[in-house]
Amino acid sequence: ELGANLIVPHEALFWNHGDSREVVAGNETFEAKCALLDDWGGAVWRCHDYIHSGVPLASDGSMVDGIFYGFAAKMDWLGSAVDKSFMRYRIEPTPARDLAQALVHKLGLNGTRLIGDGDALVRNVEIPMHIMGRDNDEIAHIDSDDIDCILAMEFIDFTVSEYIRDAAMLGQGKCAIHMGHFNGEDPGMECMSTWLPAALGDAGAGLPVTFVPMGDTYQYVLA
């Protein structure tokens, strides 16, 4: 409908880290997706490491991770970032439930999961890199650096989630908001769609670049 002949996604097309076709050969969904792309006839460039490794978006022109810069911009937290990773923030004291609601509203989510103390007054916020089951370092870091709230892309019940819940029950005022991986990174790709034409210089003049949001990964069935 847009007439585009290049799609720039952030994550792999075929559900594995190296985007290997061999491991999914014969899979019905893989075959259908390939047929759809072949019928379309355009090109796909997976832009993952490039935008994470640094693009000149900071106010001083320095290189920053474009994905998390875009997240900070979407949340109106550019001025609250602790450093140029844009993964740690010092925000005005905010009740955890209010922060979760703000996240849902600003990212356009269907909802989110809140773990721990919903009444915690959140100041120190962090987006952990990944929570995938071997999370001793992350638990130690939350404790030693006095992190009030983590905004998790992935979440494992038997490690960080259990720790956050115990800390909250012991009155330590900690919480976690599980926003989802794609939901947290989508704003960075939206940011790229505005930056890309300028980055191309004269070649980008008049180039139509359209951001197409993925939409929330999750649907919620409530009690």
Model regions: which residues?
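Active-site catalytic microenvironments in core metabolic enzymes, especially phosphate/sugar-handling
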Residues: E1-A223
